[in-house]
């Protein structure tokens, strides 16, 4: 049974790879004509900021279609669980890929990827705010005539359906690597994390002090009491992006 599952996982992974890499093509007019706001709205992602791999969380709160390729984005960033900054900007669609074969199973639904670039400016206190820029990919699936976010519930695939790779530039001009995703953070050093048998990544001790301690305590630290674990999980599961502040805020 395990061998069958492994073979199934490998086949699905290859299909995803084939979909994302081999079939990239020019934007399709029928897809671009639709409102793709739903692909970006309410996304929660996690990533790294800087060479020390400080934890950054990103949540997109509002999306509005400007034209066939451009969408206005509003969202909130949180660095090391403490500095929260609202941001606004845009994503631009550059190309669309379609899978050679539609992938649908109990755990996965994917018809292709949308690729593009983004620019988000944090606003508020110049001591903390900056600008995010880079490239993104977003998985999609067709639901009748509607386009919806792709779906993947198999952690073992280590597959990102939402992925942003780029940099963050401070108001003073300091530039840092900054990438985030829904599953596996891109652009991390080889020693950033280890994967367990379930396909979950666990940040290595070297980087934990940079905002990752609570995540480790919530799901992977076996030396804590039930109450301590519960407290850590509440922090991870809270809707931290619901704030009224129009500027950067320190927790």
Positions of predicted regions on the chain:
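Mid-length scaffold segments of soluble, non-membrane domains
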Residues: 79-87, 92
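Charged, amphipathic alpha-helical segments
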Residues: 52-59, 93-104, 125-153
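Tryptophan-anchored aromatic micro-motifs
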Residues: 26-59, 69-81, 109-124, 128, ...
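Eukaryotic low-complexity, non-globular regulatory regions
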Residues: 212, 217-251
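Short beta-strand elements
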Residues: 179-191
């Amino acid at each position: 049974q395990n061998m069958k599952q492994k073979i199934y996982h490998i086949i699905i992974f290859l299909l995803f790879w084939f979909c994302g890499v081999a079939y990239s093509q020019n934007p399709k007019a029928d897809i671009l004509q639709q409102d793709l706001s739903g692909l970006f709205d309410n996304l929660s992602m996690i990533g790294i900021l800087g060479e020390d791999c400080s934890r950054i969380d990103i949540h997109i709160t509002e999306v509005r279609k400007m034209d066939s390729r451009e969408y206005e984005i509003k969202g909130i960033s949180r660095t090391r669980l403490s500095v929260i900054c609202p941001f606004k900007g845009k994503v631009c669609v550059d190309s669309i890929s379609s899978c050679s074969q539609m992938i649908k199973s109990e755990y996965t639904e994917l018809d292709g990827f949308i690729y593009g670039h983004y620019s988000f400016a944090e606003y508020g206190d110049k001591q903390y705010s900056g600008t995010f820029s880079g490239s993104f990919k977003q998985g999609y699936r067709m639901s009748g005539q509607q386009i919806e976010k792709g779906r993947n519930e198999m952690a073992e695939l280590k597959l990102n359906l939402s992925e942003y790779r780029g940099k963050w530039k401070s108001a003073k001009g300091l530039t840092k690597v900054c990438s985030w995703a829904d599953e596996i953070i891109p652009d991390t050093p080889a020693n950033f994390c280890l994967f367990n048998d379930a396909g979950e990544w666990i940040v290595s001790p070297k980087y934990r002090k940079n905002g990752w301690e609570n995540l480790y305590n919530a799901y992977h630290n076996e030396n804590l009491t039930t109450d301590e674990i519960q407290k850590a999980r509440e922090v991870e599961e809270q809707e931290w992006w619901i704030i009224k502040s129009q500027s950067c805020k320190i927790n």
